[in-house]
């Protein structure tokens, strides 16, 4: 065969690869997924596996690498996390079937799935406590919308989303993949950290989208789900089209779409989410975030629900009160709460198990998860009292009515089923008599043969009769030649069929033995086939009740979250907030949940603080001054987090909290350079501040820290001053404004609703002690030099700083001209005063003796004696 000849197998590979150009192709060959050409080079490097070669193509070696099927999911996860997409081509027949078409026929293969970051369903590829969202952004004329789905749980939602709102929404959802029309350029999408997938404009066609959605949900019109705009239909249609492409026609079990309104949740932009560390700490990861500090959930769906609530606190006052009422009820029922949480700990992730069953990607353990989850649901429902809050009552209604399915799964499945259906062994003994007999033949073939042999001995009366086996005859009955006449005569000859006569033995068979032989030889395959048949039937039985099971799973997640909030409130001494539609914001003894948790580990108490922005209908601003390290930023953040927790339905870390409904939370606390986009720290700060001033409404809660610090003093003061005036006059919102510009404290006497507050410090013998107490009033000093000293700056720098500070403060008390003269006279560029000369080191006795020695005057004997004398001085 020449190098240019393409083998049938390689021709098939190239054809499949051409149909999936943007993905690494996992090409099934026996027990391995093989990769070739460029795919092999990319995968070998990404997976750190050996790169080999297999034959030639057009004169060049064909690069090849492979991964075993049993370990494929781990390799898949690595590739997905590194940004690759993977097309999986499976063998659709066994080699024996292929050979029926000809000796050189290739086993038929098809891509059964395209694995992408937003379309994962396996537990090994997913984070159990986080959603895995796939988003689609669509624009039609002057309308735009964002749709998102988690195919591992069946959630589908959509909202109107003008382009300026896209970044905040993506920050809220944190999707793994975003679908856009191929002509749309979104270079900045990398900031969100998700994969960007362009689709053809046809995928976003709204007319086709409506038909696809109606077919998916089996309805004639979508009106019962809501009145969707063309852009919303377009976004949802693109999602469904992409899922059809990646799942190769096996669409996931999506629930009817939920249309979220823009005003339904508290608006929080990307910068604020980052600054408040709601679900992710600034250092990256979950540890150190609000989510990690408050998560007491005991189920994966409950944890995902908690993240959704913290990311999207509601503005529905009735819903807030309903959730808080349920939490209050469980705080007052400790025994019931603990029993519920004990049951919930045994609830598996039914949502994801159900999704895998719908995609025909499930194993027996997914069915066992449904069984265990529904059984615990029944137990919880039976334990709950008749009198319960409305939210709990509604949840309980969805937990019952699954007795028949639970009984079926109990009878059908073993207690601990294997991971994969192909391994068998998951159908319980006694569920199917035929399967039991087949397994008995497979596992106890010798015993069955011995039992049949005993029966034949009894019938024939020949004690030496044996049932034997060889590769030519298979199973046969053997007697000695002395019994041949008896066996060949009626009535035995009617049952026993002569097979062979040898030199001393005669061999027979019977219909029963032939059938038994066939059953034994096929028992293994037949047992697997029977189990697969039962698996398919059980899968159908579960999917027929998918809607009810999904509602039960969501209800269990709700109960988990309610009980988690109640447990948090009791153990952390949190209080129920009073939420109404006023403009109040009064917090007594508020605490920062994350900082308090960190301090507790070191045995340090957290200093609680009050905050009162309740001034009726007028704007309410606290202007906070005080030194760095005193706790201003912590105070700002803790009040924003208290508002967020309250509207998420949780009790809050305070002695008392009265909060008028908050529509938006904005935070500008800390900034850093954005080198990739050519923006300095000051520019980043100004962009974030501009977003706040342009968007905050009169129900917003705004926290601002050190506005204007990144530029010259007078420029910074001017910007901070004007920003505060704008918040007061135009935005008219509730705000906490921390600054080092003490000149701004004069605004408290000029603007109604602006009050001064300061963080208390104490000086003791030249040191500054931070009390971390926020009090009304203004700070008289910044204590910057003292903080610098605590940070470890050299003593010469601290002394020089004090000199310059004293001169500048003296100039403040003089006229402007005198002040400028003092600044001009300061030797600002003179070298720092030299450090004091070190004291002369004390001379040792050895050194003194050495100075007295004249080497040229010493004899050898004297030199040797001197060495001993010097050594004695050392001791």
Curated annotation (Swiss-Prot):
InterPro entries: DNA_mismatch_repair_MutS, DNA_mismatch_repair_MutS-lik_N, DNA_mismatch_repair_MutS/MSH, DNA_mismatch_repair_MutS_C, DNA_mismatch_repair_MutS_clamp, DNA_mismatch_repair_MutS_core, DNA_mismatch_repair_MutS_N, DNA_mismatch_repair_MutS_sf. It comes from the Bacteria. This protein is involved in the repair of mismatches in DNA. It is possible that it carries out the mismatch recognition step. This protein has a weak ATPase activity. The lineage of its organism: Bacteria, Pseudomonadati, Pseudomonadota, Alphaproteobacteria, Rhodobacterales. ATP binds at residues 626-633. NCBIfam families: mutS1 (TIGR01070), PRK05399.1 (NF003810). HAMAP family: MutS. Belongs to the DNA mismatch repair MutS family. It comes from Cereibacter sphaeroides (strain ATCC 17023 / DSM 158 / JCM 6121 / CCUG 31486 / LMG 2827 / NBRC 12203 / NCIMB 8253 / ATH 2.4.1.). Keywords: ATP-binding, DNA damage, DNA repair, DNA-binding, Nucleotide-binding. GO terms for biological process: mismatch repair. The gene is mutS. One of its GO terms (cellular component) is cytosol. Residues 845-855 have a biased composition (Basic and acidic residues). Residues 830-855 are annotated as: Disordered. Pfam families: MutS_I (PF01624), MutS_II (PF05188), MutS_III (PF05192), MutS_IV (PF05190), MutS_V (PF00488). GO terms for molecular function: ATP binding; ATP-dependent DNA damage sensor activity; damaged DNA binding; mismatched DNA binding. CDD domains: ABC_MutS1 (cd03284). This is DNA mismatch repair protein MutS.
């Amino acid at each position: 065969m020449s190098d240019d000849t393409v083998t049938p197998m390689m021709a098939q590979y190239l054809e499949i690869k051409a149909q999936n150009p943007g993905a690494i192709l996992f090409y099934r060959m026996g027990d391995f997924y093989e990769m070739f050409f460029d795919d092999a080079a990319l995968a070998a490097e990404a997976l750190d596996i050996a790169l080999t070669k297999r034959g030639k193509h057009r004169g060049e070696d064909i690069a090849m690498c492979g991964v075993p099927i049993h370990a494929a999911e781990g390799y898949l996860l690595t590739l997905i996390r590194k940004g690759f997409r993977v097309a999986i081509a499976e063998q659709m027949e066994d080699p024996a079937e292929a050979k029926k078409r000809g000796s050189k026929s290739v086993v038929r293969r098809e891509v059964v799935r395209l694995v992408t970051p937003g379309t994962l369903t396996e537990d090994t590829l997913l984070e159990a406590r986080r959603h895995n969202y796939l988003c689609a952004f669509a624009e039609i004329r002057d309308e735009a919308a964002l749709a998102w789905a988690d195919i591992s749980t069946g959630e589908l939602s959509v909202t109107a989303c003008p382009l300026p709102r896209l970044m905040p929404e993506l920050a809220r959802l944190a999707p793994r993949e975003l679908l856009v029309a191929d002509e749309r350029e979104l270079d900045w999408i990398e900031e969100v950290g998700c994969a960007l997938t362009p689709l053809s404009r046809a995928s976003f066609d709204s007319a086709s989208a409506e038909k696809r959605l109606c077919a998916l949900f089996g309805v004639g019109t979508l009106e019962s789900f809501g009145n969707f705009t063309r852009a919303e239909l377009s976004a949802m249609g693109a999602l469904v089209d992409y899922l059809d492409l990646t799942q190769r026609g096996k669409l996931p079990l999506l629930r009817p779409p939920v249309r979220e309104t823009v005003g339904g949740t508290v608006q929080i932009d990307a910068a604020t989410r980052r600054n408040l560390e709601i679900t992710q700490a600034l250092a990256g990861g979950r540890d150190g975030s609000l989510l990690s500090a408050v998560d007491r959930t005991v189920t994966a769906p409950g944890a995902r629900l908690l993240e959704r609530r913290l990311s999207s606190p509601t503005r529905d006052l009735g819903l807030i009160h309903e959730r808080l009422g349920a939490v209050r009820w469980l705080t007052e029922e400790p025994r019931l709460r603990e029993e519920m949480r004990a049951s919930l700990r045994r609830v598996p992730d039914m949502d994801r198990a159900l999704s895998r069953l719908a995609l025909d990607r499930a194993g027996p353990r997914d069915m066992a998860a449904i069984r265990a989850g529904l059984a615990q649901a029944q137990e919880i429902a039976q334990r709950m009292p008749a009198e319960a809050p409305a939210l709990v009552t509604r949840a309980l209604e969805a937990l019952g009515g699954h007795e028949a399915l639970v009984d079926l799964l109990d009878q059908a499945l073993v207690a601990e089923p294997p991971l994969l259906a192909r391994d068998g062994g998951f159908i319980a003994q006694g569920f199917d008599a035929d399967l039991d007999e087949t397994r008995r033949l497979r596992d106890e073939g010798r015993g069955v043969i011995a039992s049949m042999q005993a029966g034949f001995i009894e019938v024939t009366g020949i004690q030496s009769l044996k049932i034997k086996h060889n590769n030519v005859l298979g199973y046969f009955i053997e007697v000695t030649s002395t019994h041949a006449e008896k066996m060949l005569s009626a009535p035995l000859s009617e049952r026993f069929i002569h097979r062979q006569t040898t030199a001393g033995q005669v061999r027979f068979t019977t219909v029963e033995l032939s059938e038994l032989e066939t059953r034994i030889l096929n028992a293994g395959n037949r047992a697997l086939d029977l189990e697969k048949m039962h698996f398919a039937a059980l899968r159908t039985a579960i999917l027929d009740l998918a809607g009810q099971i999904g509602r039960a799973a969501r209800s269990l997640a709700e109960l988990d979250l309610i009980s988690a909030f109640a447990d948090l409130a009791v153990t952390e001494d949190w209080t129920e907030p009073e939420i109404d539609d006023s403009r109040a914001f009064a917090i007594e003894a508020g605490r920062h949940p994350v900082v308090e948790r960190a301090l507790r580990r070191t045995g340090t108490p957290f200093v609680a603080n009050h905050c009162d922005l309740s001034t009726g209908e007028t704007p309410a601003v606290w202007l906070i001054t005080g030194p760095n390290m005193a706790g201003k930023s912590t105070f700002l953040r803790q009040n924003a987090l208290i508002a967020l927790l309250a509207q998420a339905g949780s009790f809050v870390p305070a002695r008392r909290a009265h909060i008028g409904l908050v529509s938006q939370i904005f935070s500008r606390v800390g900034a850093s350079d954005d080198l990739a986009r050519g923006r300095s720290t000051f520019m980043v700060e100004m962009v974030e501040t501009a977003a706040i001033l342009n968007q905050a409404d009169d129900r917003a809660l705004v926290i601002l820290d050190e506005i204007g610090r990144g530029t010259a003093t007078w420029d910074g003061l001017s910007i901070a001053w004007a920003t505060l005036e704008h918040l007061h006059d135009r935005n008219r919102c509730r705000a906490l404004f921390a600054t080092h510009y003490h000149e701004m404290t004069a605004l408290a006497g000029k603007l109604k609703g602006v009050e001064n507050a300061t963080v208390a410090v104490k000086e003791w013998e030249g040191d500054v002690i931070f009390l971390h107490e926020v009090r009304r009033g203004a700070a008289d000093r910044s204590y910057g030099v003292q903080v610098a000293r605590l940070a470890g700056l050299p003593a010469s720098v601290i002394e020089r700083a004090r000199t310059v500070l004293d001169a500048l403060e003296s100039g403040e008390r003089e006229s402007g001209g005198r002040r400028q003269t003092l600044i001009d006279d300061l030797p600002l560029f003179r070298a720092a005063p030299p450090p004091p000369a070190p004291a002369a080191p004390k001379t040792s006795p050895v050194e003194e003796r050495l100075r007295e020695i004249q080497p040229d005057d010493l004899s050898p004997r004297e030199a040797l004696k001197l060495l001993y004398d010097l050594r004695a001085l050392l001791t």
